């Protein structure tokens, strides 16, 4: 059963009515945009959201493996494992995935933004991008702390290496710049190599 805020939000999602040979058909706006190969990644990156994004990517690949997919991102970040599920699927499928930052792409959101197809990663002019090192929290026996600390360091190194590959920045620059929260404007993100261009308007 849906909780009250979720049901209210769902009720506010606009519906689009289309005329077909069989009569009228209505879609929620996100389903209609999915038909145009547009996916929205909005809010916290977590397991349920990642499963939905992965499913949409795989569906659109099955529909047409040669046509580009657009992923619009407005996210404060979230789970590394959920984000990596989306990232790996973006790299795995055949269609190019273009990424567009609307609003913000922070933490794992910025990582996914940079993971779009080369030449097809964009920011809208007033969006913000933030990169930093992965956050880790752990509760348990003292003997397990070292194990989890080592795991976090391994994840940090992996993410930094992937960011270096996508941005063209040297690894030592990525390590320095992700040591603390590092906020960038759209233009700064383009200069850094997280995106390829800033979209002012459709061409």
Swiss-Prot record:
It is an enzyme of class 3 (hydrolase). PROSITE patterns: CLP_PROTEASE_HIS, CLP_PROTEASE_SER. It catalyses: Hydrolysis of proteins to small peptides in the presence of ATP and magnesium. alpha-casein is the usual test substrate. In the absence of ATP, only oligopeptides shorter than five residues are hydrolyzed (such as succinyl-Leu-Tyr-|-NHMec, and Leu-Tyr-Leu-|-Tyr-Trp, in which cleavage of the -Tyr-|-Leu- and -Tyr-|-Trp bonds also occurs). The active site is at 107 (nucleophile), 132. It holds the Pfam family CLP_protease. It comes from the Bacteria. InterPro entries: ClpP, ClpP/crotonase-like_dom_sf, ClpP/TepA, ClpP_His_AS, ClpP_Ser_AS. The keyword Ribonucleoprotein does not apply. Its EC number is 3.4.21.92. One of its GO terms (biological process) is protein quality control for misfolded or incompletely synthesized proteins. Its main location: cytoplasm. Transmembrane segments: none annotated. GO terms for molecular function: ATP-dependent peptidase activity; ATPase binding; serine-type endopeptidase activity. The keyword Cytoplasm applies. GO terms for cellular component: cytoplasm; endopeptidase Clp complex. Keywords: Cytoplasm, Hydrolase, Protease, Serine protease. It is found in: Cytoplasm. NCBIfam families: clpP, PRK00277.1, PRK12553.1. Belongs to the peptidase S14 family. Fourteen ClpP subunits assemble into 2 heptameric rings which stack back to back to give a disk-like structure with a central cavity, resembling the structure of eukaryotic proteasomes. Cleaves peptides in various proteins in a process that requires ATP hydrolysis. Has a chymotrypsin-like activity. Plays a major role in the degradation of misfolded proteins. PANTHER family: ATP-DEPENDENT CLP PROTEASE PROTEOLYTIC SUBUNIT (PTHR10381:SF70). This is ATP-dependent Clp protease proteolytic subunit. It comes from Shewanella woodyi (strain ATCC 51908 / MS32).
């Amino acid at each position: 059963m849906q909780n009250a805020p979720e049901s209210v939000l769902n009720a506010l999602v606009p519906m689009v009515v289309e005329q077909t040979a069989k009569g009228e058909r209505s879609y929620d706006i996100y389903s209609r945009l999915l038909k145009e190969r547009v996916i929205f990644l909005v809010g916290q990156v977590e397991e349920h959201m990642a499963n939905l994004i992965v499913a949409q990517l795989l569906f659109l690949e099955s529909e047409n493996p040669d046509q580009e997919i657009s992923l619009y991102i407005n996210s404060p970040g979230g789970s590394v494992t959920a984000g990596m599920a989306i990232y790996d699927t973006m790299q795995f499928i055949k269609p190019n995935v273009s990424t567009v930052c609307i609003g913000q792409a922070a933490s794992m959101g910025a990582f996914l933004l940079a993971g779009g197809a080369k030449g097809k990663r964009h920011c809208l002019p007033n969006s913000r991008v933030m990169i930093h090192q992965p956050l880790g929290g752990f509760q348990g026996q003292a003997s397990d702390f070292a194990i989890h600390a080592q795991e976090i360091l391994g994840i940090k190194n992996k993410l930094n290496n992937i960011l270096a590959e996508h941005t063209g920045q040297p690894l030592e620059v990525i390590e320095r710049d992700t040591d603390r929260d590092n906020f960038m404007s759209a233009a700064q993100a383009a200069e850094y190599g997280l995106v390829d261009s800033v979209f002012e308007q459709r061409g």
